[in-house]
From Swiss-Prot:
<feature type="transmembrane region" description="Helical">
    <location>
        <begin position="365"/>
        <end position="385"/>
    </location>
</feature>
<comment type="similarity">
    <text>Belongs to the Ca(2+):cation antiporter (CaCA) (TC 2.A.19) family. MHX subfamily.</text>
</comment>
<keyword id="KW-0406">Ion transport</keyword>
<feature type="transmembrane region" description="Helical">
    <location>
        <begin position="477"/>
        <end position="497"/>
    </location>
</feature>
<dbReference type="GO" id="GO:0005774">
    <property type="term" value="C:vacuolar membrane"/>
</dbReference>
<dbReference type="GO" id="GO:0030001">
    <property type="term" value="P:metal ion transport"/>
</dbReference>
<keyword id="KW-0472">Membrane</keyword>
<feature type="transmembrane region" description="Helical">
    <location>
        <begin position="511"/>
        <end position="531"/>
    </location>
</feature>
<feature type="transmembrane region" description="Helical">
    <location>
        <begin position="392"/>
        <end position="412"/>
    </location>
</feature>
<dbReference type="InterPro" id="IPR044880">
    <property type="entry name" value="NCX_ion-bd_dom_sf"/>
</dbReference>
<dbReference type="Pfam" id="PF01699">
    <property type="entry name" value="Na_Ca_ex"/>
</dbReference>
<comment type="function">
    <text>Vacuolar transporter that exchanges protons with Mg(2+), Zn(2+) and Fe(2+) ions. May control the partitioning of Mg(2+) and Zn(2+) between plant organs. Could play a role in Zn(2+) accumulation or tolerance.</text>
</comment>
<feature type="transmembrane region" description="Helical">
    <location>
        <begin position="195"/>
        <end position="215"/>
    </location>
</feature>
<feature type="transmembrane region" description="Helical">
    <location>
        <begin position="341"/>
        <end position="361"/>
    </location>
</feature>
<protein>
    <recommendedName>
        <fullName>Magnesium/proton exchanger</fullName>
    </recommendedName>
</protein>
<keyword id="KW-0926">Vacuole</keyword>
<feature type="transmembrane region" description="Helical">
    <location>
        <begin position="444"/>
        <end position="464"/>
    </location>
</feature>
Length: 539
């Protein structure tokens, strides 16, 4: 994918109509460029909104597959020193802090990473960097920090409190996320302005590894590398038994694991279902923690996620059946004919996405890894379409490409972050994963999202030309970062105050939750307006 600025310049032709540069290219159908710019703008905005619906659907599938990956345990057999009997326990394969950074944050940031890396490989040998550009990354960071916090804070039910259980890990992740953008400013404005050297690219990528090590050290409370902070209260059970709400009179029906959003909400609303990404385990004297997981033995694990007498292929087949079914079991219970018609229309709107995403294998294959990888590929594909729509919106409307970069494009590439954090805020008992995904995604976008493409290009340019990589789309970076950090302070201060006064970062009294949400959205609007005025030359 070329830079948004380069793509917009390619899309704009020299012919002018009434003083406006006419966009001659098309994306949806041939002959599209013969339509008026106003009509095309409406079509592109509708297409962008439809892509957001698709991103929401596939991100939910991604989150479900990640649940299966993270909850995987391995059997540990020990001998009782007194009775000499075998004691079988199960130890979690994944550390939940590492899972938040390397699976959740990396996965939701995969659109930026994959598209930028493919662009770097496709344009290898170019002396100027392409990709999303620094402006989009700062805009994406602002979208992650403000609108996603605004959504997550109102997700818990009225009066329900969800707080960060490990403040030490959160502080480590927060510092690394802010440092990522300070580092971006240093290498683009101070160290070697508008130039990326091989050393700078290598150091950028290595810092992702340092983030993982430092966060893990804090989680394990390693001396000299961790903050002396205690953990908060955690649930007694890691994965409580789920209540099967899908049972009806016909026990032989295949369980609908590809259920609609309404059914998903009903099931996730039950407090008998808990996700376990960031509920950290306490250390014992030996430094090893064992968990007895009730659903890990082979017999029950095989049954989990599918009904009696059903197979994996039955479930996979049922995904396609559900994709073309307009009336669900839940909608049949609705008495109002108007609500049933509205639900059927919504299912019709979702049908193309559901049919496409039905190709994602069931999440209980290979502990969820295959579904995890398939989901990432689909997320990247939809994100690519988002970038094309945003390019064309800039082209037909004449909106400054930089404004599009840190608004529509940043929102599109960060949409999976929003959906994943919202689901985590709904289904987990703490706020750890929901907020960790915000801060860690911002880190991943810099250390990996542009670090890897820069490393690919700088290595080639160093050996081929003995030249560095040049950056030409860093306009307004200093000002945008200044506004970002200023508004970020306002966001973090409110989160801390909520912790001290209300007792949690998310939830609480409904009025205060909505006021906090409105405040976070106001900070985002301030960032967007001031950055837009700066790149437009108004201020």
């Amino acid at each position: 994918m070329a830079s948004i600025l380069n793509q917009t310049q390619e899309l704009q032709e020299a012919s002018k109509v009434l003083g406006h540069v006419r966009c001659e290219n098309f994306f949806i159908f041939p002959g599209e460029n013969t339509l008026s710019d106003g009509l095309r703008g409406v079509l592109y905005f509708l297409g962008l909104a439809y892509c957001f619906i698709g991103l929401s659907a596939i991100t939910a599938r991604f989150f479900k597959s990640m649940e299966n990956v993270v909850k995987h345990s391995r059997k540990v057999v020990a001998i009782d020193p007194i009775t000499k009997a075998e004691i079988i326990t199960y130890k979690k394969v994944w550390n939940f802090t590492i899972a938040d950074i390397s699976l959740l944050a990396f996965g939701t940031s995969f659109p930026q990473i994959s598209l930028a890396t493919i662009d770097a490989i496709r344009n290898i040998g170019e002396r100027y960097a392409g990709g999303l550009g620094p402006g989009t990354l700062v805009g994406s960071a602002a979208f992650d920090l403000f609108p996603i916090h605004a959504v997550c804070v109102v997700v818990p039910k009225a009066g329900e409190l969800k707080k960060i259980s490990d403040l030490g890990v959160w502080l480590v992740e927060l510092v690394w996320s802010f440092w990522a953008y300070i580092w971006l400013y240093i290498i683009l404005e101070v160290w070697s302005p508008n130039v990326i050297t091989l050393v700078e690219a290598l150091l950028t990528v290595l810092q992702y590894g340092l983030l993982l090590v430092h966060a893990y050290a804090q989680d394990k409370r390693w001396p000299y590398l961790s903050l002396p902070m205690s953990r908060g209260d955690r649930p007694e059970e890691w994965v409580p038994e789920e209540i099967d709400t899908s049972k009806d009179d016909n026990d032989n029906d295949v369980h609908d694991v590809y259920s609609d959003a309404a059914q998903e909400a009903v099931e996730s609303g039950s407090r008998n279902i808990v996700d376990i990404f960031s509920i950290h385990s306490a250390n014992n004297d030996t430094g090893i923690t064992y968990h007895t997981v009730a659903d890990t033995p082979p017999d029950s694990a095989t049954k989990k996620g599918k009904a009696k007498n059903s197979s994996v292929f039955d479930i996979w087949k049922h995904q396609f059946v559900d994709a073309i079914t307009l009336e669900t079991s839940e909608s049949k219970k609705v008495d109002s004919i108007y609500l049933r018609i509205a639900n059927s229309f919504w299912q019709l709107l979702l049908a193309p996405w559901k049919l496409l995403f039905a190709f994602v294998p069931p999440c209980n294959i290979a502990h969820g890894w295959i579904a995890f990888i398939f989901s990432l590929l689909f997320i990247s594909g939809v994100a690519f379409v988002v970038t094309r729509f945003t390019d064309l919106i800039s082209c037909v409307t004449g909106i400054n490409p930089y404004v599009i970069a840190f608004t529509a494009l940043a929102s599109g590439t960060s949409w999976p972050d929003l959906v994943a954090s919202k689901i985590a805020a709904e289904r987990q008992l703490t706020a750890d994963s929901a907020i960790a995904n915000i801060t860690c995604s911002n880190s991943v976008n810099i250390y990996v999202g542009i670090g890897v493409p820069w490393l690919i290009n700088t290595v080639y340019n160093y050996f081929a030309y003995r030249e560095p990589l040049y950056i030409e789309n860093a306009k307004g970076l200093s000002f945008s970062l200044l506004i970002f950090f200023a508004t970020s302070v306002g966001c973090i201060v409110v989160l801390v105050l909520r912790r001290l006064i209300i007792g949690a970062e998310l939830g609480g009294p409904r009025l205060w939750a909505w006021l906090t949400s409105a405040y976070f959205m106001m900070l985002w609007v301030v960032f967007v307006v001031l950055s837009s005025l700066k790149v437009s030359g108004v201020i």
